[in-house]
């Protein structure tokens, strides 16, 4: 997939609709009967990485769901995600090695927004420790195509092109990018993975800030994590109406 040029952030209307994240959290309870039918896991460790300006509290519902699906779900334990730095990347690497040693198994990485960019970098650096990567609304094709970057005056900084090119590179482990066309924070096109035998994109109808507790996104995560280690197949579809998830073919 060729690099995108001058991706625009989402419209101000979509940004205003981000408030629906609270409704998506409230909708999680009535969706539990649907989620009860998702596959259970094999107990392998999963490291969940929060988004920008968020911490482990924001991923509590996601981790609780994963534990109910029989995974060892772990927080990142690095406080608020204040943006990339060599220190954070180094400490995340230590956290990954710790979990690998503790469980004696490779670790699946689930990253929300900026957390997904961290997950991709970890998998690039230590593929031997990573089982698979799942990103939620993570703009790895162009991190600057976001309303946050625009408001902070960080759009098209020097070196941003080199960073985006590195982030776009396909990973050596199975990769699923979950995205929403109605995302109000980042351009959904900036979340598109280059499709391949072990790479895919899955679309849900969710806000950016609510994706980590959106029923359809949780169902996709459960489906992806439940695949036996060493095997992988593309996602097809799940759910109905607002809880619909389906694979997006980019070829």
Where are these regions (language model features)?
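Flexible, membrane-associating and regulatory peripheral segments of lipid-active enzymes
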Residues: 1-46, 59-64, 69, 102, ...
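Generic surface-pattern signal
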Residues: 28-31, 97, 101, 154, ...
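Short amphipathic alpha-helical segments, especially helix-boundary/capping motifs
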Residues: 25-26, 36-40, 67-73, 92-96, ...
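A near-ubiquitous, low-amplitude feature marking generic local secondary-structure context
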Residues: 2-18, 32, 45, 49, ...
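Residue-level detector of functional hotspots within protein domains
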Residues: 11, 32, 38, 57, ...
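Serine-dependent carboxylesterase/thioesterase catalytic core
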Residues: 44-57, 61, 65-173, 178, ...
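Helical cap/lid subdomain of alpha/beta-hydrolase-fold lipid enzymes
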Residues: 4, 124-251
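Phosphate-binding glycine-rich loops and adjacent basic patches that engage nucleotide phosphates
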Residues: 20-29, 50-59, 176-188
């Amino acid at each position: 997939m060729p690099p995108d040029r001058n991706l625009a952030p989402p419209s101000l209307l979509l940004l205003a609709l981000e408030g629906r994240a609270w409704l998506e959290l409230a909708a999680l309870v009535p969706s539990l009967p649907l989620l009860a039918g998702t596959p259970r896991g094999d107990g392998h460790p999963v490291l969940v990485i929060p988004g920008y300006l968020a911490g482990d509290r924001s991923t509590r519902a996601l981790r609780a769901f994963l534990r109910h699906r029989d995974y060892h779900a772990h927080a990142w334990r690095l406080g608020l995600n204040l943006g990339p730095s060599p220190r954070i990347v180094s400490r995340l690497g230590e956290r990954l090695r710790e979990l690998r040693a503790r469980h004696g198994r490779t670790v699946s990485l689930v990253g929300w927004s900026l957390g997904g960019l961290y997950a991709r970098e970890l998998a690039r650096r230590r593929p031997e420790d990573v089982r698979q990567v799942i990103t939620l609304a993570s703009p790895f094709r162009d991190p600057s195509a976001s309303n946050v970057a625009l408001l902070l005056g960080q759009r098209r900084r020097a070196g941003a092109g080199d960073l985006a090119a590195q982030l776009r590179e396909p990973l050596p482990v199975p990769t699923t990018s979950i995205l929403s066309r109605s995302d109000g924070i980042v351009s959904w096109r900036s979340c598109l993975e280059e499709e391949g035998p072990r790479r895919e994109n899955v679309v849900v109808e969710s806000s950016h800030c609510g994706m980590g507790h959106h029923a359809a996104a949780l169902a996709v995560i459960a489906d992806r994590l439940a695949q036996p280690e060493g095997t992988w197949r593309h996602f097809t579809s799940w759910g109905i109406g607002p809880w619909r998830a389906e694979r997006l073919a980019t070829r």
